[in-house]
Amino acid sequence: MGQTLTEKIFSAHTNKQVSAGEIIESPIDMVIGNDITTPLSIRAFEESGATKLANPDGFCIVMDHFIPAKDIASANQARISRDFAKKHQLKHYFDERDMGIEHAILPEKGLVLPGDVIIGADSHTCTHGALGAFATGMGSTDLAYAMITGKNWFKVPPSIRVVFKGKLQEHVYGKDLILEIIRQIGVDGALYKALEFQGDTIEQLSMDDRFSLCNMAIEAGAKNGIIAADSITKEFLASRKSLRAEPKYYQADADALYEQTIEIDVEKLEPVIAYPFLPSNGKSISQAVKDDLKIDQAFIGSCTNGRLSDLRIAAQILKGKRVHPDVRLIITPGTQQIYKDAHQEGLIDTLLEAGALISNPTCGACLGGYMGILGDNERCVSTTNRNFVGRMGARSSEVYLANSAVAAASALKGKITDPRKL
């Protein structure tokens, strides 16, 4: 019997044929921590008596949740990671001087590669599956174990094959593909399974859209989301200044055993809006327009949709116009490099002239930490990945998940708007 893409990667790392359901211990190529989760890992690392990282070049800390510090507590917490990075002379450490959201900056820096096994103490580590890697989130103690040993244990997940067919309509993106699959299968429809994305739609999808797609695999309960590397992947890698190692390319076998195959024709797919309070509560933009949903805030950013293409989409829609007077539009570039590139393209000026607020790269608004918190009964259309009760602020606030075009168009009109109708 053939193997799925996830099984292929684990087999290569363990030097044996593995299949779904097996418990294995695998070497880790990249271990990722951030300013919130790494301090707990550092504590466990030091309490174990460890003094050296098993693989210093395969460990990365990204300060992205509360950086610059939002208060004294977060400033003190950040010092733990900073001191550890300095003590161990970490090569891959990203702070205020070269900052970015972890799941945007690692691909940008060439630190995650096809064929890798990647773990991170952040649930959206699955983003990196867009590059053809196995990538999943774990807890801080699991991270500490990998810091000490360079390995971790896994139960090889069964795979669901998701085949997207057809050409996407204007202003329908990778974000809409993942919101549609979550709408169909629910937030636990892929519980501890690999979502392997295939089809001619995927073959035409940009890397930025692939990152958005894989980013939200966890919102369906998936262990990981993954796309086989192809010419688009290779073009992306070729544009990096350097790569951590040589990529390893794998493809699923034609006779691979999948637990389920889901086929979706995207030809008639509209932009999808996930209503409160679950990412699975998806409705079409046409329905959202009928519901006449006035908004207080629009947010464009996060590890889901804070890439250069998202800023280009927003600038195209907002150019020469002004944000509705009742709406706050907050835009958070995913990395400093994205910010710089957007500035060089004139996007930042366009967005500022439209009335947007441009923040530093941060996860702050997405998790209701800072830089975009919602007050009582406020409503936000957001390009983030979660819309649980109180996710971005007050428990009575509402978050509607959407793509960047919808968020920008809605900011203009003061209510959730179909960007295709502008």
Curated annotation (Swiss-Prot):
Pathway: Amino-acid biosynthesis; L-leucine biosynthesis; L-leucine from 3-methyl-2-oxobutanoate: step 2/4. The keyword Iron-sulfur applies. The keyword Phosphoprotein does not apply. This is 3-isopropylmalate dehydratase large subunit. Its cofactor is [4Fe-4S] cluster. GO terms for molecular function: 3-isopropylmalate dehydratase activity; 4 iron, 4 sulfur cluster binding; metal ion binding. Its EC number is 4.2.1.33. Belongs to the aconitase/IPM isomerase family. LeuC type 2 subfamily. It catalyses: (2R,3S)-3-isopropylmalate = (2S)-2-isopropylmalate. Heterodimer of LeuC and LeuD. [4Fe-4S] cluster binds at residues 303, 363, 366. It comes from the Bacteria. Keywords: 4Fe-4S, Amino-acid biosynthesis, Branched-chain amino acid biosynthesis, Iron, Iron-sulfur, Leucine biosynthesis, Lyase, Metal-binding. GO terms for biological process: L-leucine biosynthetic process.
